[in-house]
Amino acid sequence: MSVLCLDLGGTKLMLAQVEGKTLLDTWRYPVPADGNFEQLFDFLVTCIHSHLTPETCGISIGIPGMVDMQSGTLLEVLNIPALPATQLAQLLKNTFETDVVVNNDANLFALGEAVLNRNQDMLGITLGTGVGAGVIFNGQLYSGKHCAAGEIGSLSYRDGIIEHYCSGQYFTTHHHMSGEYLYQKACEGDSQALQAFAHFGEHLAHMIAQTLLVYDPKDIILGGSVSQSFPFFIEALKQKLQSLVYGPQLADLTISASQHHNAALIGAAQWFLQQQKSSKFN
């Protein structure tokens, strides 16, 4: 039996049929830029309906925001204006007559990385349209009471919040070019693009420094679309971090980019199976 897993972001939707730690099939769709909740819900229903099979035992969804993980109710969603606080899991359960779970996308990314890499104490940080983190303590996902344990993008920084400087928003706002375009230019050796990523790395160091003071993880794994630019910002990040963090805390810390393109989908399947095993379904 497989789990149909969804990773819903601000610009794209990833789906996969997942069996254990194996992705059987994957699909990608652009998320409609305009529209209301009804239109977005219809979009999700259409995508899910296209890929449900008799072997599918349930649906697991990651979203960028806070979730009541017991009921699957969305409490606050970031970067998807058409998705309000709503009982998304129950609505989909009623539609497809199957079990549905919902969790924060960064939580599922971290859970997937922990399962694939056997990490016991780590942060999985997603760098995409926004910023989020999943926290793994002693091999278990820690979400906090309101699924907000990793909402580090909302930390105060400069003239706003740190997400504005540590996500794809930084490049469009401060360099007036997309992160994808700057990545291509950096690959060509363009000095302006390389400098933009160096500055990005310095901002990211400030965010990581704050998370180290709170969580003190052994490993930090970066995911999300911006993480593909890891080689262009890691040195600036490390250099800045040395001036911000107590030396021994950095001695055995590893910071790396994810080697698993769909870790969040693996994490979504694992989350569903954990809920199923603990008899959370009615």
Where in the sequence are the language-model features?
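ATP-binding/phosphotransfer module of carbohydrate and carboxylate kinases, centering on a glycine-rich
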Residues: M1-G58, M69-S71, L92-T98, E113-L123, ...
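Short beta-strand segments
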Residues: D7, S60-P64, N103, G124-G130
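A cytosolic small-molecule/anion-sensing beta-strand core signal
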Residues: E19, I63, Q70, F137-N138
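Short hydrophobic alpha-helix segments
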Residues: W27-Y29, L78, K145
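A short acidic/small-residue loop/turn micro-motif
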Residues: V31-A33, A82, A149-E151
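Gly/Ser/Thr-rich active-site cleft segment
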Residues: G58, G62-T73, V77-L78
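Glycine/small-residue-rich loop that forms an oxyanion/phosphate-binding "nest" at active or ligand-binding sites
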Residues: E76-P81, V100-E113, I125
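Glycine-rich phosphate-binding loop of actin/hexokinase-like ATP-binding domains
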Residues: Q120-Q169
